Amino acid sequence: MASFFQSFRSSSMAKQLLRFALSRLDLLDTQALDLENLDFALGRNTVLEFRDVGLILQKLERLLGLPPAFSLQKAKVLILRVTIPMDFYASPITAEIDGVDIRLKVASKKEKDRQDAGKRGKGMAGSEAVPTAADLAQSFLETQPVAEKEELEQALAAETQDLAASMAASEPESDDDSPVGTGQPLSLPVFLTNFLHGIVDRIQIRVQSVTFQADVEVAVDSNSPVPEPVTFQLSLDNINVEGVTSTSETPDEASTIVHKEGKRHVLLDNIRAALITETNVLSSLARSASMPSSSASRSPVAPRSPVDNETTAFNPSGLSRSVGSSAMAGSRDSSDDLPQSQHLQDNEAAFNIPYDFGDSNEPNEADEASPLSTPRASLYRGSPPPTITDHAKSAVLEPSPLIWSTAEREAQSVPFLRPPEGFPLSNDPSPAASVHSSSTNRSSGSSARDDLAESHIYSHEDAESMYMSAFSQTGSQGLRTGMPGAWDAFDDAEESETEAGPSTSTQAAPYDGSFDPPQPDRIPSPEQPSQDQKRNSPSFYAQDSSAEVPEPPQDDIPTPRGPTRLVKQLLSLSSISIYLPSSHKHVKIDTPDDGKSISPNIPGAFSMHSAAATSPKPTPADEPAGETTPIDPSIEIVLKPVEIQFDASIGFLLAMVVAQLLEAAQGGSKDAAGPTAAKPPSASPDVKVTVEQLSVLFLEKLAGVADVPQRFFEKSTPDLSSDVLLQAQVVDLRGSVSHDGPQTEMDFSIEKLKFGYANDDIVSFDRSVLMFESVANTFPSAGQDISVKATMGPEISRLEVNTLPLYVQLDLQKLDEVFGWFGGLSSFLNMGTSITANTSRADKSPANPVQKPKGVRFDEPVHPDDQAVTRENKTDLRINGLQVDVLGKDCSVMLNTSAFKLVSREGGIGIHLSRIRLSGPYFKNSRAEPPIVSEVLDTRVEFLPSPRAKDLERLLELITPSSNKFDEDEDEIMVDTLLRQRRKGSVLSLAIGKVRFDAGNLPQLTCLPSLIDDLAKLGTVAKYLPEDDRPGLLTLCHVKNAECRVDFGGRFGAILTSLTDLEVAHISMPQLAAVALGEIAVTRNKIEELVVTSPPPQTGPWQNLPVFRLRLIDDMEPVLKIKLMGLGLEYRVPTIMDLLNLGQDVTPEDYEAGLAASVASLGEQAHTVIKRASSGSLTSTGQAKAPRSLKVDVAFRDCLIGLNPLALPSKLTVALTDAHLEMVPGPQELVAVTTMKRVSVLLIDDISILESPGVRFTTSRRPPVVISTQVAELCTMGYVNICQISSAKATVTVSRDSQGDTQLEVEVRDDLLVLETCADSTQTLITLANALTPPTPPSTEIKYRTTVFPVEDLLASIRAETFGRAEGEYDLDNDFDVPQELGDDADSDLDFDAGPSDSPLNLDSQYLEENIVQEELFDATSSSMLREGATKFEDTNDGVLLSTAGLDNPSSSGLEISSSDLSITDDYFDKGPVGRGTAHRWDSKTDRYDQHNEIKLQRSPLKLCVRDVHVIWHLFDGYDWERTREVIAKAVKEVEAKAYERRAKTDRRGGFDPEFGEDEPIIGDCLFNSIYIGIPSNRDPKELAQAINHGLHDFGDTESIATSTVTTSTLRAAGQRRRSKSLRLDRSRRHKITFELKGVSADVVMFPPGSGETVNSLDIRLRDVDVFDHVPESTWKKFATYDLDAGERELGADMVHAEIITTKPADTPATEMVISATILPLRLHVDQDALDFITRFFTFRDETAPIHASPSDVPFIQRIVVNSIPIQLDFKPKRVDYAGLRSGKTTEFMNFMILEGARLVLRRVILYGVSGFDRLGDQLNDIWTVDVKRNQLPGVLAGLAPVRSLVNAGSGFRDLIEIPIREYRKDGRIVRSLRKGATAFAKTTGTEVVKLGAKLAIGTQNVLQGAEGLLVPQTGESSSNAAAVAAVLGDDWDEAEYEEEINRKFSLYADQPLGIVQGVRGAYASLARDLSVARDAIIAVPAEIMESEGAQGAAAAVLKKAPTIILRPAIGATKAIGQTLLGATNSLDPMHRKRVDAKYKKH
C-alpha cells in the first residue's frame, strides 16, 4: 500500500480533493478564499491562514432550517488557520478559528408581514444537506481526468494483489485466529471515502471567541407604539474539538482534555448568556412602589473599582499545538523578513475615557505585530502556527481584574470595544515570531444592517471622519477604518470586520500619547492558564440593536456621552464536554511500511489483514498488548457547574423574549415539517448526560454593567450572598438514553435537589422525615434523591420515578419578606400578568376567524396501524413520603403523608395516599401536643380527560336526583346541554376512606387566623392560573366515613360529629356545586345527641336516601338549594346553657335574652356569608357587575326537631314532613321565609319507652289523616300525634337600625293548626313547655312588691287643668279605685271598685231609678261604659264596650254628652294593630299605662307578629299515657278489693250490721284531681268498671285494660291485649269537645334595655271563638259562641282581646305581669255531659310531674283587669248528685232546672297580686259566683224553660206601654208612638206565642215517640244490622263504635224549615210518612192473626201493632204542627234560624 500512497502523494489529486471538499462545504465565502490559487505541498507541514472570512448566510439559513421570522444579519470568522501536517493520513489536520460572530434578528410581526413570502420559500426549496464523505469522493472522481483515475486504480489494484500474496505467504500454519477469506479488490471511491473519513476523524478544531447575538423587539409598554430593542447574547471562550484518534501529549493537556478511546472530545469552555437592553426597559419592568431605601440607593450598574495596578498578560492558548520540531525551526527562520505593523492608539478625549491603557515608562517594549488585514490565505512552510490565547473570563458580578479580550471583538453591541491594532496575535515577543505577510488593507465595505440605534444622531461616515481626524497617524501599514466604541460599515456585497489582537490591562497612568505593548516576561504559559484568569475574565460585551433604517445625518447635534444600555449576565457555564463516537474504524499508521497493511479493515477487503510488524512498537504499560478496550458508542455530555441568575425585571423580560422567539419559531414549523418528515429515519445514538451542579438564583437585584468601554477594565464587587432571594440547586444530575432495537431506555438520577433561600431550604429530599414506614416503600439507590427510568417502544411507553421523602418548609414570614420587595406575592404576580397582557395586547392583532366550509364534515377515522395512537403510555411516580411544614409568625402546622403514588395511563392519572396527617399549631420552644390532629386514610385521586358513564350518572344523581327531587315544582335543568358540555371536559375523582379530626385546647388556636391570612396571600396564585376555553374541571369527591371531635373544654365538653357517604361535585366553569350526605350524627360528651339521622322507613320509596343535599348553579338568579331528609335536631336546655356560658343561677328571662341574641347573631352571620358568596363566587370574572343576591332555598322532608325539657323524661318532637325555608339577603337586611305545608307535633311522656325492648304499640284507632310513614312509625314507638300544621308561613327579618343594633322581626301566618290531646297529654305538654327554660333559682330576698308606694306629696300631682268645667257625670267610686274599708284588709287578694257584700255601695241598678249613679264594675248595662272615654280609662278605644252599651237599657242611648268631652282621634283607622309600631307600657308607681315611645319601640330588638291563624283544638276523652292508665287500673283494683273485703265481713256477720249502714263512708279514691273512684255500700263492686266507663263516655275506644292483669312494673304496651269491657281508658276514637279559634293574632314586642321597667308586651286577639260539643249523648252543637242577640259586632272587633305586659320594677328581682282582658258577649249551650268532660279534662293534675319545676317559676300577676262579660246561658242537666246534696253541695240544685236564655253578667274585676293562673281561675270563679247568686238571680230565674216564653211575652206588654211613652217624650206624636208600641207588642207576643205552640207540638211528639219506643218491643233488627256491618268491615269492625253511632242523638229542633212554606211542605211529607207506617201496620194485622194459632196469638198480634196504629198518626200530626209553627217562627224572626243552627246538631 506504500507504493499506492506514493502514487497518490505524487499526484495532484490530494490537493484537488482538499479544494473540492472546501468548495462543496459551501459555507465559506469561496471568492474571498480564492481556492483556485490555494496551494500546498504534501510531505511538509503547511499552515493556511484566512482573515475576515464570511459565511454564506443563505446557505447557513438553509442548513439550520430557520423559520421565516429569523434572519441572519452577519456570520463571520475573523481568523481561520488550517495546519496540514506532512503525514496527514496519520496525523491530525488542525483548524484554528479566532473570533466567530453570528448575529441573528427576529423580525417583529409587522416586519414579518412586510417580508416577501416567496423569497424565503424559494430559498428553502433548494435546501441541501451537508455532504458525506462518500458523496464527496464520488463527486470528486467524476470531476477528475480519466487518465489520473486509471493510473490510481492500477496502482491500487497492484497494491491489493501484492498485499494478498504477502498475506498468504506470511500466514503461520498454527495461527487459527488469522483472518482469511476471499476479499474483493479495494476500489478507488471506497479508498477515497475511507481516506476522507480518516481525515475527518483525525481533524482537530480550536475555536476562540464565539459570539451569538439575537436581536428582538419587545413591546414592554402597551402605551408606547415603538417596541424596545433587546439583545440576547451567547458567548463562548473556547471550543476544542479533539480528533478521534488523538492522544494526550502532556500531563497538563491530559488534565484539561480528558481523552476517551474512539470518541471525539468537544469542549465548550466558559459559556455565558446575557440580555442587553436599554436602561428604561428594565426600570419599567422593575417595581415602582414599596422599595426599601437601601435598594433605592443602589445603581442599576454594578459598582466598579479602579483599574488594577498589576498588568495582566494576554494568554493565547487555542493554537499552541506544535506539529513538529523541524517545522517550527523552519517557521522561525522564514519569518525574519516580514514587515511589522505600527501601533495605533485610540483617543481618550473622543470617548471621555479618564484612564490609560499602559505605562509608557515600561522597559523592553515589544515590537508591534503586523495587522491581520488580508482576507487572502497565506502559505507557511515549516513554521509553527501562531497561537491565539484564551481571553480572560469575566463574571460581571464577581471581583476580578478586567483585561482585554479577543473573544468578542466583533460580537459587541454598539458602542463596542476593540484592542489597539498594534497588539500582536502571537505570544512570541520577537518580531520574527510573526509569520504573517502584509497585504491589502481590510475591506472597507459595511452592511446597512448594523445601523445606529435611535438614540445615536451621527451617521457612520460622519463619525468615522471625526474619528480619523482625531487619530490621524502615518506609517501604519494596516490602518483600520473602524473606531473603538463605534460600529463598522458594511455593504451588500461583502462583510468585513477588523480583528482585535491580544491586549493587556496595565496600570492607569496619565496619557502620554503612546501605547506600550505587553512585556514578554509577563506573558504566562499558554498551556497553563490560571484558574483566576478563567474565573475572572470578562464575560460578554454589549451589542448594538439598532433599527434597520438609519436616521438622517444631523451634524448640529452633539454626540451623546451617557450610556443608555445595560448588560446583565443570565447564564454562566464553566464548560461542556461532548464525546462523539466515530462510526469509522481506524488503524494508526506511523510511517509508510511495505510490510504492513495500511487499512485492513476497509469495507470490501474482507481477506486483508495486517502482517506481523518487523519491529513492533512498544506497548504502553497501562494498555497490555493483545487486549482491546471496547469502545462505548454513546454520546457523552458533561456539563460543569451551571449557574443561572435573574431578578424580577430580567425574568419578565426574558419571558417576553422567549415567548416572542417561540412565536416566531412556530411560524416556520409548518414549512419545515414537510421536508423533515420526508427524511428516512436514522438510528439515534445513545446519549449520556452529566450535570455536575446546576444553580438557579433569583436575585433581589441583578447587577449589570453599562454598555461602555470602561466595563472591560474596571472591577465590580457586588455581594451576591445578600442579594439571593430564592435559589434552586441540582447536584450530580446523570442521565442516559440507550436504544435496543425499536425500544429506547432512559435513566436519570439526581444526587441532591434543593430549592429555597440563600441559607435555608424550602423543598428538599430527606429520608429522616419519613413518618409512616411501610414494607411497600422502595427508595432510590444510595446517594440519590431522585431516580427516573423511562422505556419507550412501539407498543408501550413507561416512565418510573422514585424519590426519597419530600420535605417542604414554607416559612410564610420569609416568603412575605422575599416578595415584600415587590409589594407582596399578589403584586408580583399582578406585575407579571400586566406585563404579559400588555405585550400580548401590543403584539397581537385580532385574527380573522376562519370560516368553515358549509356541508357535512366527518372526522377522519383513526388508523389501526398508527403507533402514536395505539401506543400505551404508562407513568409511575412514587414519592416515599411527604412532610410540609408551614411556619407562621407565632406557630406552625405540619402535614405528613405516607408514600405518594401516582400512576398515569392513557385513560387518566391516578394518585393514592394511604395516610395523611395534619397537625398543629406548634409553638416555638414548646413540646406540647398539638391541639388539632387530622388524619385521612385511603385517599385515591383520579384525573380523566373525559368523564365516564358512571361519573355522569353520579353528577346527575347529585344535581337532579330522580327519586328525591330538590323541589316538587322545580324547574328542570337542561340535562342534555350539561352532558354535552361535560363530555368535553375533564374529571377529577377523589375517594377517601376515612377522615378523623380531633381538636382540643381551643385557646391555643388564637394564632391560626394570622396563619390563615398568610396562607390566603399564597392562595391568590390560583387566580393567575391560565384559563381554558374548554368546560371547567368536574370534581367528584366521595368520603365514606368522617369523624370530627372538638373538645371545647369547661362545662360544654366535647362534640363528636360522624358523617357517612359524603359526596361532593363541583364544576368550575360554568359554576356548579352539589353535595350529598348519607348520614350524620352529632353527640355531646358521648351521651347527648344533638343531631341524628332518623332511621329510614321500613317501607316506601324513600329508603337509603341522603340526609343532606346541596346544589348551587350559577344563573341569572342563583339559588342555593338545600334539602334535608330524615335529619333530627335535638334541643336540650343544659346544652344551650353551657353553650351560652350561663350559670346555674340564671333566670328564664336571661336565658331567653341570650338565646334570642344568639339567634340574631346567627342570622347576621348567615347574611354576611350569603352576601360574600353571592358577591364573590357568582360574579363573572373580568367584568364589573353588581353582585347578584344569592337566594337560599332549604327543603325539609321528614325532619325531626326534638325538644328535651330539663329534668323531665318527656319529649316533644316536631316532624317536618314538608317544609321550606327561603333566605334572600338584601342590601341591609336578611329576609327568611319558612313555609310549612305538613308538620306534625308528637309527644311522649317517657323517652325510656323508645329504648326498651318489646312489641311496638299498636292501636286500631284509625287516624283521620295519615300524615307520613315516619309519623306512623313514631306513633308505633310510643309517640302520640298531638298537632298537625298545614299552610303555615313564618317570615323572619334580621336588620340593623340606625345605631347599629340588631333587630329581629318575625311574622307568622297559619291557615290551619289542629291540636289533639287528652287530659294527661295536655298537662304533659304544659309541663314540658315550662321546662324548656331553666328554672328560677330559689332566693331568700323579696321577689315581688307587696306594699303600696307611699304618697310623699299629694298636692304635687294636682294640676290646674284637671279642674276644668264641672260638666258631665262623675262616679266617685270609679275615680277612687281602692275603698278605705278594703285597704285595711291585708289578706284580701282582690280589689273591687265597689266592695263585697258588706260595702254600702253594693246596690243593684235594676232596683234603683235612672238618675241614681250606678255601680260600674258590676253593671254591664250601665251608661258608664260610654263615659270611659270621657273619664280617660285605658279602654277608651275598645269597640266591644261601645257595641254592647245599650243592650238592656235602650234609654241610655239618648244620653247627652258634651262635645267637649269627646276625644277625637283623626288617625284612628290609619293606625295598625298593637305591635306594628305601638305597644302599651306600664308604670308600676302610678299603676297606670305609660305613654308609649315611638322611637324606643322602633328600636325593639324583637318583634313577633302572629296573623290570621286558624286553631282547632280537639279534646279527647281517655288517656294517652300507659302510666296514667296503669295508675287508674291499679286504683280500681284496690278499691274493688276493699269492697269485696267489706262485703265478705258483712256476710260473715250473717246479716245487716248497723255499723255498715247507709251512713257508712264510701270506699273510694280520687286520682289526678279529676277521677273519683268510689263504691257505695249498697253497690256491687263489679259495677265499678262500668261506672267509670260510663263516666268517661268512651264509646269510641277499642282497647281496654283488664284489672286482673295490670301490673305496676309494666311501662311498655305488651302488644294487643285481650278484649275486656272492664275498663276502657285509651284515647277515644272521636273527640268530645272542639275549640275553634279563628283569626288568632298576636304581637310580641321586646323593649330595648334601659327603656323602662316594661320588658315586653304581648297583645293577643281572637276574632272568633267557638266551642263545639261532640259528646254523643248531647244534642247541642256549640258549647260556646258569640251571642247574636247582643247585636251586630263592630267591624274588625275581636271576640277576645288580651294584653299582657311583663314588667320588672326597679326594686324587685323578678318579673311581674299586668293583664287586661276583654271578651264579647257569649252564648253558652251547656250540656251536663259536656260540662263534666271539660271539668274533668282541665282539672287533671299529675302530682309526680308538676307544671312548674320551681315555685319561683309560678307567674306573678301584679294586676289583672277583666272587663264585664255578658252571658246568655242554656243549660240542660241530666244527673243529680244526691250524695253531694247531702254533703251540702248546693250547686247541685242547678241540675234540677233547665235553663233557656238565662242572662247574667260577669262583672268587671280588677285583681292585684295573684300567683299563678290556677289561683286566678279559682278567685274569679268565687267572685263571679257570689255576685250572680246575690245580684243576678232574677235574670237567671227568668231563663227557666217553663217560664221563658211567658217572660218573653210579658216583655211585649212592657213594650206596649214603654215605647209610646218614650216616643211621645221625644217628639210628642201620639199616633206614631202608639203604632210603634203596638207593632213591637204584636211582634214580640206573636212570635212568642208561635214559639210556644211549636214547643208544645214538638214536646208532644217527643213524648209520643218515647211511648212508642216503650210499647213496641225491639226486634233483632239492630243486631242483624250490627252483624251486617261487621261482615262488611271485617277487622275494622268495632262494636263500641257501632254502639256510639246508634246511640248518637239528635234534637227535633234541628234542621228547621226556612219559612212557613217549607214548614208546610215538611209537615205534609212527615204526616204522609207516618200515616203510611200506620197503614202498613193495619194491613199487616190480619196476616199475623191468620198466622197465629189461637186467640192468644191473635191478641198478641193486635197488641203488637196497636201502638203503631194508634200513635203513628198522632206523632205525624204533632210533627206536622211543629214543622209548620217552626217555619212560621223563622219567618217572623229571621235571627231565630241562626240561633238554632248554632245550638243543635244536624248530623
UniProtKB/Swiss-Prot annotation:
Domain of life, per UniProt, equals Eukaryota
Q: Where is this region: Disordered?
A: 111-130, 288-341, 353-392, 413-458, 469-488, 493-563, 839-863, 1370-1400
Reaction(s) catalysed by this chain, per the record, are: a 1,2-diacyl-sn-glycero-3-phosphocholine(in) = a 1,2-diacyl-sn-glycero-3-phosphocholine(out); a 1,2-diacyl-sn-glycero-3-phospho-L-serine(in) = a 1,2-diacyl-sn-glycero-3-phospho-L-serine(out); a 1,2-diacyl-sn-glycero-3-phosphoethanolamine(in) = a 1,2-diacyl-sn-glycero-3-phosphoethanolamine(out)
One Pfam match: ATG2_CAD
Q: Which GO terms describe its cellular component?
A: endoplasmic reticulum membrane; phagophore; phagophore assembly site membrane
Which UniProt keyword terms apply here? Autophagy, Endoplasmic reticulum, Lipid transport, Membrane, Protein transport, Transport
Q: Is Lipid metabolism among the key words of this record? A: no
- Spell out the Low complexity composition-biased ranges: 288-306, 434-447
A single GO molecular function, which one?
A: protein-membrane adaptor activity
Q: InterPro entries this protein is in? A: ATG2
Its membrane topology, per UniProt? Peripheral membrane protein
User: Any idea what this protein is called?
Assistant: Autophagy-related protein 2
